[in-house]
Amino acid sequence: MPGAKDLIMKLDGTCGYQMQSECDGVHDGSPYKQVNPMQHYENTASERGSRVDGFNPEYGSPTIPTVETLREVMDEKDLWPINKEVWDYHDGGGFHLMSTMYTDLTNHYGPSSSIEEFATKGQAVGAMNSKSIWEVWNYNKFGYGDRYASGLLFWYHNCPVSQVCARMWDYSLEPTASLYHTQNALEPLHAQFDYLKNTVSVYNDYYQAFKDYKVTAEVYDLNSKKVWGKSQKIDIPEDGVVNDIFTIDFPQNITQVHFIKLRLFDTKGKEVANTFYWRSNDKYEGRKTLTGPTSSGFEDLSKLKQVQLKTRYQTYQEGDRHFIKAEIKNPSSTVAFFTQLQLLG
C-alpha cells in the first residue's frame, strides 16, 4: 500500500518496516516444486541463484500424502492409474510437479501396481527432499560451509487445502515421512552425510561446545552386511559445525543400493545422535537430469527380505489427554526399511 512505510514510521519510529517476506533485506525464496535432491547439495535448485545463502525466507519441497488422505482428495478411479488431469487440478495446476517429476522419481524405486504401493514409495522421495534441504542448511550455518547461511524458513509445513502435495503433514493433519526426517535432520546434535561429497559432518545447535566426542560411520549392503566402517574423535564448537570430518569410501563391488548408519557418542560412550541413509550407486549427471545417489537406481530395494517386527505398547492418561507409547524392535539381522507405524481403530 502506498505510503504504508511513512505512516508506520510516523506512528512508531522505533519499529523497522518489512514490506514483504522476500526480496526486502533478504534474498528471494523458492523453489517449492520438485527438483532433483542432488541440486540441494549442488546449490543449483533455482535458476535465480543460490538458495541456502544468507537468510532464505521461503524454501520448500513436496511430499505426497498418505494413501488414506489421497482417498479423501479424489475418487478411486482417478487415483490409480494416475489421472494426470485430476491430479494436476489438485496440485495447483501441476505447480509442484506431482504427476510428472515426483512420479518419475517415485518410479525409480520400481514400478507400482497400486496407489498403496505408489504412495508408500513416494514417501521416500519426500523424505529425501526435506532432509537434503535441512542438512545443506546445517552444513552452511553461519559460514562453516562454503556459504554463510543465517536462516531458513521452510514453506510450508502443511496443506491449506486438500491436495496431492503435502509437506510435513497433510490437509488432514496426517504426518508424512518428511516430518520425521526433518526432525532427525534438525536434532540439536546431528551427524550427517553429504551425497555430493560423500563426507560426514556434525552439526551442533547447543550454546555449548563438546570435546572429545566420537562420530562413527557404517555402510551396509543390500544383504544387511557391514562392508565399511570408520570412526574419529572430534571437538564440536558451540553453536557450530565440524564439516567434512572424513570421506566414506564405498567399496567398488558394493550392491547397487546400500545403507549408511551414522552415530555420535559422548565422552562416556553414550550414543547421543544417530542418522540413517539409503544410497544408490547411480552417478549424478547434472541438474537437468533425475540421476544420482539420492534420486535413481533404487529398484533393488524390493529385494530386501521381509522382516517380522516386534511391537509392544502401553496406554496412559494425563488429565483429559490419552497417549499410546509404542516400541518397535527388529529382532532380525536384516534392515527393516522405511517402516510405517499405523494405528487402526
Which residues fall in each region the model found?
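Intrinsically disordered, low-complexity Pro/Gly/Ser/Thr-rich segments with frequent PxxP/GP/PP motifs
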Residues: 213-215, 221-255, 345
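Short acidic, flexible loop segments centered on an aromatic residue
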Residues: 206-224, 329-345
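Edge strands and adjacent loops of beta-rich recognition modules
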Residues: 284-322
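Acidic/polar loop patches that form or flank catalytic/metal-binding clefts of enzymes
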Residues: 12-21, 151, 191-194, 228, ...
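Substrate-binding clefts and catalytic carboxylate motifs of secreted carbohydrate-active enzymes
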Residues: 42-213, 218
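Short beta-strand elements of extracellular/lumenal beta-sandwich folds
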Residues: 197-202, 320-333
